[in-house]
C-alpha cells in the first residue's frame, strides 16, 4: 500500500523477492517543493505590493491631487489658439527659442491622440455604439469623454472644436487664463500652473491624468457593459506609453531647471504605484 510492488525471480525460478518502491516520500517531497514555490511566489507578490503601496502612500501624502482638465473650471480655447506659426505651429523648430515651437505639428502628424475623435467614426465604433443602443459613437458622451476634450458647452470658446480629439487642453488644462500670461516677459511655470496649466511634467500627475482614460476614474470608466459591446481591453504603463508618443518638448538644461527631470525607472515605478491606487479606488 505504500508503493509499487517490484518482483524479482532467482535463477532457479523458485525464489522470489517482492520490494516496494518508496514512491510516497518522493511524491510528498515534490508536493512540499511545490508548496514552497507557491509560498515564495506569494511572498514576492506581497512584498511587491507592499513596496508599491508604500510608494503610493508616500506620493499621495506629498502631492495634493490637482483638478483634471476635464473637470477644471477654465475656458477651453481649442487647438486653433495654439497652432499659430509663431506659437506652437511652426513647421520646423526654432533654433534660438526656449521651446521647439513645432509642438502642434508634431501632435497633429504623429500623435495618436490627435486621431482619437476619428476613431469614433470607424465601423468598429459604430458597431459598439449600436450594441450599446447609442445612435452614434461620435456624439455619445461616454465615448467623447476619452476620445475628445469633452468639456461642458459653457466652457468652450468659439474656436473650440470637438473633432480636434484629445487636443492640447485635454492634457494641459483649459487655457482661458494662462494662454496670455504664459508668453509674458515675466511668465513663470509656477504662475502658469496657478492659472490653470496642468502639470503633465510631474509623473504622479501625468499618471493620474493618463489613467483617468486608460483605466478609468469616477467621471469616466470603461465598464463591463462597454467592453461587452466590443470595446478593446484597456492597458497602460506610464513609462512605455510616454516613450512611444512623439515628444513635443526637449529636456534640456532650461527644462530641467524649470520642471526637473525623472528617469525611466522612476517613471515606471510611479506609474505602477498610481495604477495600483487607481485599481484600489475602483474596488473600494
Language-model segments: residues:
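Cysteine-centered motifs
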Residues: 8-10, 60
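Bacterial N-terminal signal peptides
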Residues: 47-59
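Boundary at the C-terminal end of the N-terminal hydrophobic targeting segment
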Residues: 60-64, 76
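Primarily the internal scaffold of c-type cytochrome electron-transfer domains
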Residues: 64-70, 91-130, 157-166, 174-284
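Short metal-coordination and nucleic-acid-contact micro-motifs, chiefly zinc-binding Cys/His arrays
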Residues: 75-83, 139, 164, 206
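Short cysteine-rich clusters marking metal-coordination/redox-active sites
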Residues: 82-84, 143, 168, 210
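Cys/His-coordinated zinc-binding microdomains
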Residues: 86-88, 147, 172, 214
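Post-signal peptide N-terminal segment of secreted/secretory-pathway proteins
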Residues: 130-169
Amino acid at each position: 500500500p505504500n508503493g509499487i510492488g517490484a518482483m524479482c525471480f532467482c535463477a532457479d525460478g523458485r525464489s522470489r523477492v517482492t520490494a516496494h518502491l518508496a514512491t510516497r516520500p518522493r511524491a510528498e517531497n515534490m508536493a512540499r517543493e511545490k508548496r514552497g514555490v507557491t509560498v515564495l511566489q506569494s511572498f514576492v507578490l506581497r512584498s511587491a505590493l507592499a513596496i508599491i503601496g508604500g510608494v503610493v502612500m508616500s506620493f499621495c501624502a506629498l502631492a495634493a491631487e490637482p483638478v483634471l482638465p476635464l473637470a477644471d473650471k477654465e475656458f477651453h480655447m481649442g487647438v486653433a489658439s495654439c497652432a499659430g506659426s509663431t506659437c506652437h505651429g511652426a513647421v520646423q523648430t526654432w533654433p534660438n527659442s526656449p521651446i521647439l515651437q513645432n509642438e502642434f505639428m508634431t501632435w497633429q502628424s504623429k500623435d495618436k491622440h490627435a486621431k482619437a475623435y476619428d476613431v469614433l467614426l470607424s465601423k468598429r465604433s459604430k458597431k459598439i455604439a449600436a450594441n450599446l443602443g447609442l445612435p452614434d459613437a461620435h456624439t455619445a458622451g461616454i465615448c467623447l469623454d476619452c476620445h475628445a476634450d469633452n468639456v461642458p458647452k459653457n466652457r468652450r470658446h468659439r474656436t473650440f472644436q470637438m473633432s480636434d480629439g484629445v487636443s492640447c487642453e485635454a492634457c494641459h488644462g483649459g487655457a482661458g487664463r494662462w494662454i496670455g500670461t504664459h508668453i509674458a516677459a515675466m511668465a513663470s511655470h509656477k504662475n502658469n500652473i496657478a492659472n490653470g496649466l496642468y502639470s503633465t511634467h510631474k509623473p504622479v500627475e501625468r499618471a493620474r491624468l493618463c489613467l483617468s482614460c486608460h483605466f478609468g476614474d469616477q467621471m469616466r470608466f470603461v465598464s463591463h457593459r462597454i467592453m461587452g459591446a466590443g470595446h478593446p481591453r484597456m492597458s497602460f504603463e506610464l513609462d512605455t506609453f510616454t516613450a512611444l508618443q512623439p515628444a513635443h518638448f526637449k529636456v534640456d538644461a532650461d527644462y530641467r531647471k524649470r520642471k526637473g527631470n525623472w528617469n525611466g525607472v522612476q517613471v515606471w515605478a510611479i506609474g505602477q504605484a498610481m495604477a495600483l491606487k487607481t485599481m484600489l479606488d475602483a474596488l473600494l
